[in-house]
Amino acid sequence: MIKQLSIVCPNTGGLPIAYGVCEALRAHQVYWAEQDTDSSPMRFRQFVDPTPGERVLLVDDILRSGRRLRELQELVKSKGAEIVGLAVAVFQPNPSVLNFAPLPVFYLAKMEASYYKDASSCDLCTKGVPVVKIWN
């Protein structure tokens, strides 16, 4: 058991992954950060947050830009906890992915994706292949 380690995640897709990681590592606790709206800042529930000096692993379901994990990182730092790394189920970096060095980033799968500035630079678009939106 890693009693000195706790897991911190956003309350969206990262929560099921966080509980699995907590169980696998036999970590102490899972904390999750919430947002009232997409534009509001992340926060912990009252009296349920990491303590100063507590070692935590940030966990989420997918890492693309890193924006949500960066916001979570800043929230955890503001509480005085020590971040030991990041863990995600899927690492699918986009061209503007944030750098979390020197923290290690652990992932189960890495997906390469093609990103284009506009339709004229996309081979499939120029061939007339229709665009299908799969998430918002």
Region locations from a protein language model:
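Short glycine-rich phosphate-binding loop at a beta-alpha junction
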Residues: 1-11
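Residue-level preference for short coil/turn positions at secondary-structure junctions
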Residues: 3, 51-53, 101, 118
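A structural micro-motif
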Residues: 5, 27-29, 54, 81, ...
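Short, hydrophobic beta-strand segments that form beta-sheet elements in well-ordered domains
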Residues: 7, 30-33, 84-91
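Short beta->alpha connector loops
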Residues: 12-14, 91-92
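Short, glycine/charge-rich flexible loops or terminal/linker lids adjacent to PRPP-binding catalytic cores
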Residues: 15-57, 64-67
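A contiguous pocket-lining binding segment that forms or flanks enzyme active sites
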Residues: 46-91
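PRPP-dependent phosphoribosyltransferase catalytic core
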Residues: 73-136
